[in-house]
Amino acid sequence: MATEFTGVWGRDSITLETGKWAKQAHGSVVYKTGNLVLLATVCAAEEPKEGQDFFPLTCEYTEKAYSVGRFPGGYFKREAKPAEHEVLLSRILDRPIRPMFPEGYFSEVQLLVQVLSADKQVSVQGHAINAASAALSVSSIPFAGPIAGARIGRIGGEFILNPTNEEITKSDLDLVVAGTKDAIVMIEGEASEISKEDMMAALRFAQEQLKFAVAMQEELAKKHGTVKKEVVLKAPDKDLHAKIREFAFDRLTLANKNADKAKRNDDIKAINKETVEHFKTLLAPEDKTKDIKHFLHELEYEVVRELVLGEGIRFDGRKTDEIRQISCEIDVLPGPHGSAVFTRGQTQSLGVMTLGTTSDNQRYETLEGSKEKNFMLHYNFPAFSVGEVRRNSGPGRREIGHGNLAERAIKKVLPTQTEFPYVIRLVSEILESNGSSSMASVCSGTLALMAGGVPISGAVSGIAMGLFSDEKGRFAVLSDIAGIEDHFGDMDFKLAGTKKGITAFQMDLKVNGLGLEVLQKAIEQAEVGRDHILGEMNKAISSVKGNLSENAPRITQKQIPKDRIGELIGPGGKMIRAIIEQSGSEISVDDSGKVTIASPSEESKEKAIAMIDGIFEEIEVGKIYDGVIKRIADFGAFVEILPGKEGLCHISKLDVKRVQSVRDIVSEGDKIKVKVISVDKMGKIDLSRKDVLLDN
């Protein structure tokens, strides 16, 4: 039976429909606002696969080219590999939805959100989260939702719910929040160095807006008559669990106090192996290896959390707000345009910068049309960084997401194209990882930019905050979490910013929601940590010369009249190609007449500028020019005195004495000095070498 709910959320009219399209899916919702139409579908396997011990959730967001009346690009003219922005939005769907499933639920779930009709002014992020949650809410799949998502902007100090794409370009905040009626589940976004107070105000505003979107979904599910499937989880063997606890708890506690990741992992593996062997022998012939390993993992979870919540001790002996040891090196590579290594504990990032020209802009397609980026940050996470062996198959969702977060953190401090007309590419090579590698990428990227002479408005540092909490109400917010604290913790909250304020943030949870008071403590504690990290970075920055690398191109920009662009390009591009070939510089011109010159050396730059200036220079009668013989005729020689401007030096004016043959005096390609005698109404230039010789 078809069910529909319509309501007004902020400035938007929202319609949710179910039971009309995609009825064989376990849950499906058509979500409409403006011209935007989303189809969200979800299906779940009846039972988990044999031996399954994790939750296999897949969330995918896809945009159909037909949604804006366009053909897909490429030879086959059909949608193929997801674009980077689709991958990023898929991650935004996954992160708030994953913690809302019951613990121990291991059936495979596939959630798809497709854009069937696009509205170029509607930002889709929050609506996509709502559509996904609504599909789960009307299904029988166990789900502790609904949750809602909203995008928040701020213009002129006023917060805006679901700003249009045009409004986002004017906003100093781009925040995507997901949550329940009374708790936050996920945060992601960027800002123009906002204060922690403004950040909290934005979260409070967002929390209020989410309530109505949650209520809409609840009303739809109620109308639809949704009945949730009861999940029957395997009852644990309490007796075996108690025996394993008695056998391994104290030893695991001691092993988890080792700050060295490799040594700690080796010790824990040895304890686990010994425990498994001991109980396999004890329980033979019954094989309970999987149960033993599961209980050991639960035991380590308990150990790590009790150390923090009960004793106030982190595995490496740090206080809850203490940052690991930091070291910074700059100019570590001679070839690149800028480089630095940032090390924090056992996490290390090599940041490498390359400067390019407008021809290096990244061009990409979205439903809003073609776009270009002049700054990009690419994050690489090789297997060796964590001492593993695996196939290198290129960047996955995690690499794309981490790179995007670091890129958003840094881009707010970059100079404008007018101030610094370069395209910038940063690469973060993770050399070793033990937590918070994306924030290490922010730090190494900032150092590489400054080492390479990019005039950024301020240094950016990043930190990852964690949380341990329990049912007794105890909680501890941890600064600069290591890998084990991320793995066993409840929160991974990354914040980046300058001394002035926050530039980027991302929060994931493993619990189904946090109150604003916990988030406020994390944001305040993060600011102290970021300031400490900036202090360590500044020690290295103080030695930076601030000059462009000798290997970097020299870029100059000139403005020429719009109506004379054709003169620079020349017929069939002849003129601009000649300047490029002769000067060795790369040259481009846009529709406004802005000319960009990228040169490998100062000499190349000066030559290109002189040739361009020459095109627009007015010929002066009586002035002596350095010319090049272009053609020879019986009656004289044609001499180029400025780019694209030739005059005739008649045979009678080639020398002070009588000339029998032009070739007796000059040949093609010869350089000679000539004086301009006259320029007629048709622009024909009369030249004389004879007058120059007589003057001398």
Swiss-Prot record:
Protein keywords: Cytoplasm, Magnesium, Metal-binding, Nucleotidyltransferase, RNA-binding, Transferase
Enzyme Commission identifier(s): 2.7.7.8
Enzyme class: transferase
MF (Gene Ontology): 3'-5'-RNA exonuclease activity; magnesium ion binding; polyribonucleotide nucleotidyltransferase activity; RNA binding
A GO biological process held by the record: mRNA catabolic process
Domain S1 motif: 622-690
Catalysed reactions, as listed in the record: RNA(n+1) + phosphate = RNA(n) + a ribonucleoside 5'-diphosphate
Keyword match Magnesium: yes
Bilayer-spanning residue ranges: none
Cofactor: Mg(2+)
Cell compartments where the protein resides: Cytoplasm
Record has NAD as a keyword: no
Residue numbers binding Mg(2+): 486, 492
GO cellular component terms attached to this protein's record: cytosol
Residues annotated as domain KH: 553-612
Domain of life assignment: Bacteria
CDD domains hit by this protein: KH-I_PNPase, RNase_PH_PNPase_2, S1_PNPase
Main localization category: cytoplasm
Similarity remark: Belongs to the polyribonucleotide nucleotidyltransferase family.
Known function: Involved in mRNA degradation. Catalyzes the phosphorolysis of single-stranded polyribonucleotides processively in the 3'- to 5'-direction.
Name this polypeptide is given: Polyribonucleotide nucleotidyltransferase
The organism of origin for this protein: Leptospira biflexa serovar Patoc (strain Patoc 1 / ATCC 23582 / Paris)
Species lineage: Bacteria, Pseudomonadati, Spirochaetota, Spirochaetia, Leptospirales
Gene encoding the protein: pnp
